[in-house]
Design a protein with these regions (language model features):
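Alpha-helical transmembrane segments of integral membrane proteins
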Residues: 1-19, 268-273, 301-328, 332, ...
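Membrane-helix entry/capping segments
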Residues: 1-21, 49-50, 106-109, 141, ...
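Short, strongly hydrophobic transmembrane alpha-helices
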Residues: 16-43, 47, 293-296, 342, ...
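Alpha-helical transmembrane segments
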Residues: 28-57, 353-361, 431-460, 715, ...
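Small-residue-rich transmembrane alpha-helices
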Residues: 36-39, 299, 335-403, 444, ...
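Membrane-proximal extracellular/periplasmic loop immediately following the first transmembrane helix
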Residues: 48-98, 218-224, 363, 453-516
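Mid-to-C-terminal secondary-structure elements
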Residues: 98, 113-135, 144-281, 355-358, ...
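Interfacial "coupling" helices/loops that link adjacent transmembrane helices in transporter permeases
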Residues: 294-338, 708-750, 754, 808
Length: 827
């Protein structure tokens, strides 16, 4: 075999054009598959770092009747489950809350997890530095302690080991607390949500409040459990349903029949990967199609090269070379080609993995921690071996009956090769058609999303996170600080309007509360519960700052203080639903959500409507009719601060002066994530862009390879039929007829490939249409058919023109003498 490899290397070096094309083609196919398999393995196959992950269960409460996929749990509900369910040895709870953290580097707003003392033991996680939160850190009298996540420790604190033992001030809902950094968590999947820090309950005043501890409807906590020894998941599910049914019976006021509260349990691993499984398998299928196209194209090139080497093979056979020796020689060449292609493909796959990990993080948080390991190498090697074996057995040897070499007048043809080449071409066309159809659907969906009007002036609005920092301040003092910030920023050149809100559109999607309410004069239908609406706290000028018109009434003003009448502004959709054919101005709305009755985070009395504003959907990229009630920041609680600046200048030129103004007023004030609303929207659209880019690149590569493959087959066919074309010209056939023959041969292969692609690609297309919003598979398939046909017909025309020129040259050369003899014999 060593001798064969040496001979093969010399042979390939003598054909640099052929070798380069084959290596690059294989590198594209192998690299794409190696990168995507690494992604699939990292997200779907690779074990979690959690100890005994198969016994780690995620317990979810949902309310499908209210459109709530995950309603989370309240502490009384968790207490009932802990007391009654015996299938779990222990439970761990996790809730998410926003903190302003001061004292650990720059002031910043962090997303924090709040856990009980058994959480890390249940999750089976370990520290890389210090220790984790344990039972000794439980209870309201415990000292505040914090564990840093590995990503935050690495990116924000540069892996500084001296942070252990330092104290930070955590400000949030309910007040401020100091907490000591006690450890750094090992790299792990950030589920249920990515956080920067994880604190004990004593670090969050809100979690110590009576509302959090005693109210059954105050739901904000995720629940995990570890199966008890000998217990199975099915047994745990049965017990959970039984206990949950008893809980609903004992507390009917907390479980609305219309909301249809339900309980479910799933292994944490399955829960983490469920959203990514379908899209990753589609991605893997797309990469497999690219590999098929690449191998088919290389097979065609090898077949054409074998025909040119048929004399050599015949001589070797005549000199006694066995079929196994010939096949071994071909295998040596294939191994060298595929090995070089795999090496180049693995190198290119390394940067592809980083891009694909960001893409997959939309569907599974596990992709955030994806790293490149040895699997990339062995996948590339395995694909190279598979391709080498396939390609080595593609050519038929001289002794094959169906592919025997025939000689006639000094020319040779391989009768079996042409049929195989056509099969490979049809395969390439079909695969490229499926990929192109999928890419077309995704691009169409992306363009539709980008063209959607938001109702806001997104390009000229700068949004900056300026969260409320109390740290001993009262609500009135924070409001006064915000007012002064607005006044000073509006004095800057180019600033049109400045205001505060609590939600940055799209960037903070899902963090704003949705609450039940009712309106003066509105009567619920039989069995209808009170409707739900978004709740937002804003400053005067908010609508002008975002470029949103006030349709009726007025905006908030300085007179709408806490000592005055409680007022509200409502959205246009809410006005139409709650006050049909009526003027809502000076009517009243009031909150009825049971959560608000115990938390008292909104004014308890009815609010008089002073204005109606156009809808603002700050959650969805494609705006939907949205019911919203707005409170003035002087009359409502300050959950967080988002600064909006409407400018006629370049929005980003204001970041430095705005930062200087705010820091000059409050050195401890976090100032983060400055960017236009247009960029915030583009960030949300980035997964769709990656969808289009990934599948578009696959489709472009496959189509390019396939078009080259068709052109190669037709070129081979034309060169093999040069003598035939010359004779037909001599006998009176027109060049246009030869042109049509070549065109029809290519069109037949293209049609067969498109039909095969449409048949086998319809189901994946339907899946893609359901998975990616805005895709229409039927229309895209029709358009792609035309595009693929046009691409292949262009290649056919080039080869047809070449056939006519070849035939004319043949006619005017020595072949002309043969043609004259043939004509004389016929006469």
């Amino acid at each position: 075999m060593i001798t064969d490899l040496r001979f093969a290397s010399r042979k390939l070096l003598k054909s640099p054009g052929f070798t380069s094309v084959v290596v690059i083609t294989l590198a594209l196919g192998i690299g794409a598959n190696a990168a995507i398999f690494t992604l699939v393995r990292g997200v779907l196959i690779k074990p979690l770092v959690n100890r005994d992950e198969d016994r780690l269960i995620y317990i979810r409460q949902s309310a499908p009747g209210a459109g709530t996929e995950n309603s989370t749990w309240s502490m009384p509900e968790i207490g009932d489950l802990k007391a009654r369910v015996k299938s779990f040895s222990e439970f761990g709870d996790f809730s998410t809350i926003s903190f302003t953290m001061i004292g650990l580097g720059e002031p910043r707003e962090v997303n924090g997890g709040v856990v009980n003392g058994s959480y890390f033991e249940v999750m089976g996680l370990r520290p890389v530095l210090g220790r984790l939160i344990g039972p000794e850190d439980d209870g309201p009298k415990a000292a505040g302690v914090v564990v840093l996540t590995y990503r935050f420790w690495s990116n924000a604190l540069y892996r500084d080991p001296s942070v252990i033992g330092k104290t930070a001030n955590l400000g949030g809902v309910g007040g401020d607390r100091s907490a000591t950094i006690i450890g750094v968590l090992e790299p792990c999947v950030p589920y249920p949500q990515e956080t920067e820090i994880i604190a004990n309950v004593a670090s969050s005043p809100h979690h110590l409040s009576a509302t959090m501890v005693t109210e059954r409807v105050h739901r904000m906590t995720e629940l995990f459990g570890r199966l008890a020894p000998g217990a199975t998941l099915d047994q745990a599910r049965v017990e959970l349903r039984s206990v949950y049914a008893a809980m609903k019976k004992d507390h009917p006021e907390a479980y609305s029949k219309q909301a249809d509260f339900q309980i479910s349990a799933k292994r944490v691993r399955d829960q983490i990967t469920s959203g990514a499984r379908t899209v990753l398998l589609l991605l893997l299928a797309g990469a497999a199609l690219v590999f098929v196209v690449a191998c088919s194209n290389v097979a065609n090139l090898i077949l054409a090269r074998t025909v040119r080497r048929e004399g050599e093979l015949a001589v070797r056979t005549a000199l006694g070379a066995s079929r196994s020796a010939l096949r071994r020689m071909l295998l040596a060449e294939s191994l060298l080609l595929c090995g070089a292609g795999a090496a180049l493909g693995v190198l290119s796959a390394q940067w592809m993995v980083d891009v694909l990990a960001r893409y997959a993080s939309r569907f599974s948080v596990r992709a955030l921690g994806l790293t490149i390991d040895s699997s990339l190498l062995w996948v590339g090697a395995a694909l190279a071996i598979v391709a080498a074996v396939i390609l080595a057995f593609v050519p038929r040897l001289p002794n094959d009956t169906s592919g025997a070499l025939h000689s006639s007048s000094g020319s040779v043809r391989l009768t079996g090769s042409k049929g195989r080449q056509r099969i490979f071409v049809v395969t390439q066309i079909g695969a490229s058609f499926v990929l192109l159809a999928g890419a077309s659907m995704l691009v169409t969906a992306l363009l539709a999303l980008q063209r959607t009007k938001t109702g806001m002036d997104t390009r000229r609005v700068l949004a900056i996170n300026v969260p409320a920092v109390f740290n001993g301040k009262t609500q009135e003092q924070v409001v006064d600080l915000y007012k002064e910030i607005i006044r000073r920023i509006e004095a800057l050149p180019g600033v049109n309007k400045t205001a505060f809100g609590m939600i940055a559109p799209w960037r903070d999607a899902g963090t704003g509360p949705t609450l039940q309410f009712n309106a003066e004069g509105y009567v619920n239908a039989a069995g209808e519960e009170d409707p739900r609406t978004q709740f937002r706290v804003i400053s005067p000028g908010f609508f002008a700052a975002l470029g949103v018109p006030i349709i009726a009434g007025r905006d908030f003003n300085e007179l709408d203080g806490r000592s005055e009448e409680t007022v509200a502004i409502i959205s246009e959709t809410l006005a139409r639903r709650m006050f049909p054919n009526q003027d809502p101005i000076n009517r009243h709305v009031f909150w009825t959500d049971p959560v608000l009755k115990v938390t008292r985070v909104t004014p308890p009395k009815p609010q008089r409507i002073i204005g109606v504003a156009a809808d603002i959907d700050d959650v969805h990229i494609v705006p939907e009719p949205t019911m919203t009630i707005y409170h003035s920041f002087e009359q409502g609680p300050l959950f967080r601060g988002r600064l909006f600046i409407h400018t006629s200048a370049n929005p980003y030129s204001l970041i430095t002066p705005v930062t200087r103004i705010i820091r000059g007023m409050s050195a401890e004030q976090p100032i983060e994530r400055a960017g236009t609303l247009e960029d915030a929207r583009a960030e949300v659209l980035s997964p769709q862009r990656l969808n289009s880019m990934v599948f578009g690149v696959f489709a472009a590569v496959a189509l390019s390879i396939a078009v080259v493959g068709v052109a190669g087959v037709l070129a081979f066919s034309v060169s093999a039929r040069t003598r035939e074309f010359g004779i037909r010209l001599a006998l009176g056939s027109q060049p246009q007829r030869l042109f049509r023959d070549v065109i029809s041969e290519g069109a037949a292969m293209a049609t067969a490939g498109i039909v095969a692609g449409a048949v086998f690609g319809f189901r994946p297309g339907a899946c893609g249409a359901q998975l990616f919003r805005g895709c229409s598979d039927a229309r895209r398939f029709a358009g792609v058919r035309l595009g693929v046909c046009a691409a292949y017909c262009r290649g056919d025309r080039i080869n047809a023109a070449g056939s006519a020129r070849s035939a004319r040259r043949c006619y005017s050369s020595t072949t002309h003498r043969v043609i004259l003899r043939t004509r004389n014999l016929l006469l």
